[in-house]
Regions:
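Flexible "arm" and connector segments at domain edges
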Residues: 1-106
């Protein structure tokens, strides 16, 4: 999922600007939230949001997520797989299929 070329390009971008000093986990988490709100704003008045605008905001969210993972020294692919395993246990396919019910009500 995470291409090393993307990771290396992000690292180079940050290094060229000497921005690593600002990339604390707290600041990166805040930036994820801010960019996620901007992504949501694309859908605020129209469920059929402009794909270009959504793509730009989604890229911002993903960029900050990857930067945070890098800052924390965690592998984004592995943490997604680990979380997916936990979610599988909470939402067994035979009980959750086609339902939006929360896991504790299945």
């Amino acid at each position: 999922m995470t291409d090393p070329l993307v990771r290396d390009a992000l690292r180079a971008f940050v290094a060229e600007r000497e921005w690593a000093q600002f990339h604390t986990p707290e600041n990166l988490a805040k930036s994820i939230s801010i960019e996620a709100a901007e992504l949501l704003e694309c859908f605020q008045w129209n469920a059929d949001a402009d794909t270009d605008a959504v793509t730009e905001e989604l890229a911002d969210v993903l960029t900050y997520c990857l930067l945070l993972a890098d800052r924390l020294g965690v592998d984004p692919d592995q943490i997604v797989l680990d979380k997916l395993e936990l979610t599988r246990a909470k939402y067994p396919a035979d009980k959750a299929r086609g339902r939006s019910t929360k896991y504790d009500a299945l």
